[in-house]
Amino acid sequence: MSEELQPVFSIERLYVKDLSLEVPHAPQIFLEQGEPEVEMRVSTGSQKLEDGYYNVDVTVTVTAKLDNERTMFLNEVTQSGIFRLENIPEEDADLLLGVACPNILFPYAREAVSGTVTRAGFPPVLLAPINFEAIYQQQQEAEAAGA
């Protein structure tokens, strides 16, 4: 009787690949009044490292501006993880790398943004959860339309 190989999905390591904060108008910006406009951009990516091991990145860029022109701060974090995937069909692996892994990484990126911004002297930035499944579906549809 042949032994069926069990699927493996595990987190091997979580780490901050890149973290930067710019406060271009300090210290004057701290004296200005007004409610900042906060813009967030998120991107994801993955790469195969070796058999069964993948690196996944979630990059979050947060920009806060006063009066839609003066930048209060620009914060960027790339939260990464090394994941082990074995005995998983390719289409399922793509879904894990595009949805499950970013869902695991995003709370760490969110905490890094909030902590960095707070340590810079600003009120914390609370980022809303991201629907990585919807983003993945949009990417799949765009690739299918382009093929």
Curated annotation (Swiss-Prot):
Family recorded in the similarity comment: Belongs to the SecB family.
Tell me, which GO biological process terms does this entry list? Answer: protein folding; protein tetramerization; protein transport
Function, please?
Answer: One of the proteins required for the normal export of preproteins out of the cell cytoplasm. It is a molecular chaperone that binds to a subset of precursor proteins, maintaining them in a translocation-competent state. It also specifically binds to its receptor SecA.
The protein here is known as Protein-export protein SecB
Which keywords does the record carry? Chaperone, Cytoplasm, Protein transport, Translocation, Transport
Q: Which GO terms describe its molecular function?
A: unfolded protein binding
Major place of residence: cytoplasm
Source taxonomy lineage?
Bacteria, Pseudomonadati, Pseudomonadota, Betaproteobacteria, Neisseriales
